[in-house]
Amino acid sequence: MTKSLVQQQFGAHAGAYATSAVHAKGASLGRLVELVKPGPHWQALDIATGAGHTAAAFAPHVARVIASDVTDEMLAEARKLAAAKGLANMETASADAEALPFEDGRFDLVTCRIAPHHFPDIPMFVGQVWRVLKPGGTFALVDNIAPDTESTPGFSSTELRDAAVTYNAFETIRDPSHSRCLGMAEWSEIITDTGFDLAHKERLGKDMEFQPWAERLGADTATIGRLRAMLSDGTPALQAFLRPRLVDGNLWFTLDEAILIARKPQ
């Protein structure tokens, strides 16, 4: 997976993400603002902003927020959102999550929501967050997670490892720019190994209707059929994690999101 593939994939489907209810109004968005308790003087950065929904949610509560992304089409959507909401303190910047073009210790808050599963090098990304945060600054992360003992108890480590591999394959078939979802425990380890104090973590279930989810990135009929079979015929551990079921004749499943709030020591 290359960053150019991420740009190609999301550039082609920027409009779909601008209107996606999961990204624009998902439960994790309001919860993130609630947990962070942003200050009115704060300088904030949203990494991999996509259509700008997270930056826009924080903008009314901070002095300034930069919505950054590696994809120009997404930044255009973020600018449209800021204009529509009258957010004069929200601006955009082209930025690679693993090589941020900002000086050390610039921000009071760095956010990143439903994006790190596209990043090739998660420790590099977290290290960049550490670098650009002020001492005492807050790192607020949301991302889809893979099954592990914290999210899916009652299975062996081998069963969970296999389920995580299959789940990531499931995501990659639908979206070739997908890199890897981590488990909750792995996220916690990387964040604390970087030097952060982990202040809070929780999981949120995100109910997804299969067909719109599969179609959002333009999957063809054969790919959708393959994904449907993987979801319906998965191992017990994968089924316990994704919880596929029929609702009014339509296939639904549940993705788990991790919310992690960490602080850079003073």
Where are these regions (language model features)?
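Class I SAM-dependent methyltransferase SAM/SAH-binding core
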Residues: 45-99, 124
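Conserved Class I S-adenosyl-L-methionine
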Residues: 51, 185-188, 194-266
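A conserved beta-strand element that flanks and buttresses the S-adenosyl-L-methionine
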Residues: 111
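A short His-aromatic
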Residues: 117-118
